[in-house]
């Protein structure tokens, strides 16, 4: 009996790892070429927060293995600080998918949005709800993420 419980526990442990795999393998880069007023540490924190938001969230009900995750990159260029914690930026998103039965990837989506305004307070969690609009930052990231997943 104890052996069966141990085997059942191990089986559940190993299958749970597969179910936790998320859909994206996102790389986030934030540039601030013309910005001189804001503290540069804020943007490093923002970069890490966005990467965590994109890579750890379960966007669909589908189960993806690690090698099946969609490679994508978000290049965010902060162009100006409009007010405290309010920024104007541009974003370039590119998503790649593996070509079936080959060893290379192909670009599926490549888009640039030149006018994006959002608010970000350092160390404040990025909150998102599918049924409610909570912020310009997470709303825009989720919008482009769903496009990348849907293609």
Where do the model's predicted regions map?
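Bacterial Sec-dependent N-terminal signal peptides
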Residues: 1-24
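Start-of-domain marker
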Residues: 22-88, 99-101
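Acidic/His-rich structured neighborhood in mature extracellular/periplasmic domains
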Residues: 88-151
């Amino acid at each position: 009996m104890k052996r069966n419980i141990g085997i059942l526990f191990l089986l559940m442990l190993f299958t749970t790892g597969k179910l936790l795999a998320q859909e994206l393998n996102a790389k986030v880069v934030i540039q601030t070429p013309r910005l001189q007023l804001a503290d540069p540490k804020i943007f490093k924190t923002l970069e890490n927060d966005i990467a965590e938001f994109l890579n750890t969230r379960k966007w669909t009900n589908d189960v993806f293995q690690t090698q099946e995750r969609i490679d994508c990159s978000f290049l965010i260029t902060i162009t100006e600080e409009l007010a405290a914690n309010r920024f104007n930026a541009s974003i370039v998103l590119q998503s790649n998918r593996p070509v079936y039965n080959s060893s290379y990837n192909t670009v599926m989506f490549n888009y640039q949005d030149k006018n994006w305004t959002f608010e970000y307070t350092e160390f404040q969690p990025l909150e998102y709800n599918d049924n409610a609009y909570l912020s310009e930052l997470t709303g825009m990231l989720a919008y482009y993420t769903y496009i990348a997943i849907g293609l």
